[in-house]
Amino acid sequence: MAEKKTSTRFPYESTEYRRARNRLLQSEIKLRRQIEAVAEQRRKLPLGGVVKTDYVFDSAEPGEGAIKAVRLSELFAPGKRTLFLYNFMFPQAPDMDSPCPTCTSIIDTVDGAARHVTQRVNLAVVAKAPIDRFRQHARNRGWQHALLLSSSGNTFNHDYGAEGENGQQWPLAHVFVRRGKKIHHFWTSELWWAKPEPGQDMRHVDFMWPMWGIFDATPEGRSKSWGPSLSYP
């Protein structure tokens, strides 16, 4: 591979632009280091609590595969000791029966990456809705790869922070790990419960939602008044 340039300039840029861009580059380098430092700290977490219940979910592939019951322990494929699981808000709440547009936007992206992700770790998306409704939503979106689960018959969502006392659903990402015959909770996107910065939302799952990174690279940035929709004109 040819050696990369250590600096660059683009056609017709001003000195003012280059100075500002170089300052920004230093901030981007610091951010890259900080991202890796946080990731390393996360990787070094001790094991969380042992999962005491081998939860039974209804499961389905997005396509035409059969609906079947599957235990949490069965979500770990041979040779893969880690499970990444996303709690999808569907229904959003007892009085909001529709699937969450935000979660839908996230899984629109994750589904495309699922074949890559599952080369190394297990991946599933769980909703409280019955599995036939969840799969129909997946079909409507064109999802093809992410394993779908329904927790309608168990207490997983409530036990792991994704369901409020009134049945409100919350969008959380979780990591579980298998060690021998035991399954441990390892990590959950607890930034969801942290007070957000002024003018921001929680940004607890931005790491799996590249849309916002694209907006962050533009002059428009993120909009305080815009969010994903289930459909557009």
Q: Residue spans of the language-model regions?
A:
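Conserved segment of the thioredoxin-like fold in thiol-based oxidoreductases
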Residues: 122-152
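Non-globular targeting/processing and membrane-anchoring segments
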Residues: 2-83, 88-115, 119, 137-139, ...
